[in-house]
Amino acid sequence: MQLSEDQIIKLAPDAASVKAGKGLASAAKWVLRGASDRALWGHCQGSGKNPYQTQVDLQNIAFKCSCPSHKFPCKHSLGLLFLHASRPDL
């Protein structure tokens, strides 16, 4: 399942999360990433030692991330979605 940018924006909790997510929509921000028809996953290097492990279930539109954010979905999940929407070949 492929989500459009507009669909991703509607999932975001606020405009700041959209902006932060778009800032993470670069392959260089992700040390590992993968995709299937049903899910996206990746490791996003934050400011800490260990990258955040992010998963997006495309079938049920569900999110999981190891970051400490209280926003749902977090900027990492949104970033992974924006990256996939702009570059599904990655």
Residue ranges, per PLM feature:
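Long, low-complexity, compositionally biased intrinsically disordered regions
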Residues: 1-90
